[in-house]
């Protein structure tokens, strides 16, 4: 386990010695997340003969249940960030076009979800024909998210967010990275879930902290692993 920003967790120096796991970045504040630099190719390059699943089929579907209730798919809107200031916070802030996703996917899909109350939630998934190195994708995600060390502003078509800070990031289970960006008025919890042929990015934002992203991202990873 590696974590930072909560009592009982070791700092970054200790965390860097631990095998890291994934996330699901995402981004939002009074607006939500976006797009930016793409990561270098982190796949192992190993081919597979299995026919890849359709990315859209791997997202939560209408009527599925999440921690906040039953969901209905909708379009990822203009409030999701397309860039971050400073750029080194892109990995921690962006959902749409997250740089945590390895290059070379064969299919991509994303969706926002209509839920009860002020909790914007979204998922994106990329499918890969080649086998991903799960450890490397998660480790690189942990490293890239940790580079956001001060105030970060998300920029979207809807405008600029108020500054947020990275409050917590951890790899609490295999293939999963979670982190939290927040300010006094808004909290965004992100998750990255990685399996050998797919990467799932999760974003949940709201006025109050406490979304169970670690448990939810681990559950979504297990579901993903059974589908691809």
UniProtKB/Swiss-Prot annotation:
<keyword id="KW-1133">Transmembrane helix</keyword>
<protein>
    <recommendedName>
        <fullName>Putative lipoprotein LprH</fullName>
    </recommendedName>
</protein>
<feature type="lipid moiety-binding region" description="S-diacylglycerol cysteine">
    <location>
        <position position="28"/>
    </location>
</feature>
<keyword id="KW-0564">Palmitate</keyword>
<dbReference type="GO" id="GO:0005886">
    <property type="term" value="C:plasma membrane"/>
</dbReference>
<feature type="lipid moiety-binding region" description="N-palmitoyl cysteine">
    <location>
        <position position="28"/>
    </location>
</feature>
<keyword id="KW-0472">Membrane</keyword>
<keyword id="KW-0812">Transmembrane</keyword>
<keyword id="KW-0732">Signal</keyword>
<feature type="transmembrane region" description="Helical">
    <location>
        <begin position="191"/>
        <end position="211"/>
    </location>
</feature>
<feature type="signal peptide">
    <location>
        <begin position="1"/>
        <end position="27"/>
    </location>
</feature>
<keyword id="KW-1003">Cell membrane</keyword>
<keyword id="KW-0449">Lipoprotein</keyword>
């Amino acid at each position: 386990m590696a974590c930072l920003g909560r009592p009982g967790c070791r700092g970054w120096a200790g965390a860097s010695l631990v095998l890291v796991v994934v996330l699901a970045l995402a981004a939002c504040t009074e607006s939500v997340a976006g797009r930016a630099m793409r990561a270098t190719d982190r796949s192992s390059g190993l081919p597979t003969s299995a026919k890849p699943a359709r990315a859209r089929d791997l997202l939560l579907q209408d009527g599925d249940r999440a921690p906040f209730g039953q969901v209905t798919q909708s379009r990822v809107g203009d409030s999701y960030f397309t860039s971050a200031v400073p750029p080194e916070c892109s990995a921690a802030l962006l959902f749409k076009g997250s740089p945590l996703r390895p290059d070379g996917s064969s299919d991509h899909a994303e969706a926002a979800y209509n839920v009860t109350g002020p909790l914007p939630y979204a998922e994106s998934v990329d499918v890969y024909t080649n086998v991903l190195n799960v450890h490397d994708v998660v480790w690189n995600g942990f490293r890239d998210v940790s580079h956001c060390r001060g105030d970060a502003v998300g920029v979207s078509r809807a405008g600029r967010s108020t500054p947020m800070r990275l409050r917590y990031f951890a790899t609490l289970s295999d293939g999963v990275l979670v982190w939290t960006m927040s300010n006094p008025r808004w909290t965004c919890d992100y998750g990255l879930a990685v399996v050998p042929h797919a990467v799932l990015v999760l974003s949940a934002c709201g006025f109050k902290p406490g979304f169970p992203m670690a448990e939810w991202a681990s559950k979504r990873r297990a579901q993903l692993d059974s589908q691809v």
